[in-house]
């Protein structure tokens, strides 16, 4: 799918480009990001994870690359939903850019692609992310036990979902 450029209140979402891979690889190596993503990603692995075929947006703030927002879209009529992953550079965290990016993309998927349900699954240990997603309207719906490796130990992840009429 060819992705559009989307504008939120404070962010611009645009398709990830080849030139973004090295800077985004650097973002994933920052301590506050790496603790949730595991080992540092080389550009080739990052390219695969960002699904360079069109399933990720670069997040820009004030003209600077701030991070990325990936998605998996379920298009089967019986199961329509979109799942998200997001990562912001340390210097862009805590200012509301993540929630703005998520709101912007949720609205686009609802308005342009007909989706009504969205999910995200942060580590249960990532309080900052859980609060940010709750600010958008995501609600906890379950715990995925021992879902991800964190500091060499299996940790639970919190499954959160959002119905379009709950978007804040």
Regions found by a protein language model. Give the residues of each.
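Acetyl-CoA-dependent GNAT
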Residues: 35-93, 108, 163-167
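Conserved acetyl-CoA-binding loop-helix of GNAT-fold acetyltransferases
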Residues: 94-108, 127-135
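A short, well-structured alpha-helix characteristic of acyl/acetyltransferase catalytic modules
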Residues: 1-51, 166-168
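Conserved beta-strand-loop-alpha-helix junction that forms the acyl-donor binding cleft
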Residues: 120-130, 147-151
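Glycine-rich acetyl-CoA-binding "A-motif" of GNAT/NAT acetyltransferases
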Residues: 64-67, 128, 154
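Conserved GNAT acetyl-CoA-binding A-motif
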Residues: 112-121
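Conserved active-site tyrosine of GNAT-family acetyltransferases
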Residues: 133, 138, 160
């Amino acid at each position: 799918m060819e992705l559009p450029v989307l504008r939120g209140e404070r962010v611009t979402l645009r398709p990830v480009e080849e030139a973004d891979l090295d800077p985004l690889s650097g973002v994933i190596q920052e301590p506050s990001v790496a603790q949730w993503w595991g080992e540092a990603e080389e550009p080739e692995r990052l390219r695969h994870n960002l699904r360079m075929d069109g399933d990720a947006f670069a997040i820009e703030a004030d003209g600077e690359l701030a991070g990325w927002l990936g998605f998996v879209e379920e298009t089967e009529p019986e199961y329509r939903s979109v799942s998200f992953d997001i990562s912001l550079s340390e210097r862009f965290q805590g200012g509301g850019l993540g929630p703005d990016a998520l709101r912007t993309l949720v609205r686009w998927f609802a308005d342009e692609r007909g989706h009504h349900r969205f999910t995200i699954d942060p580590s249960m240990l990532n309080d900052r992310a859980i609060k940010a997603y709750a600010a958008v309207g995501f609600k906890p719906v379950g715990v995925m036990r021992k879902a991800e490796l964190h500091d060499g130990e299996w940790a639970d992840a919190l499954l959160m979902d959002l119905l379009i009429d709950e978007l804040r």
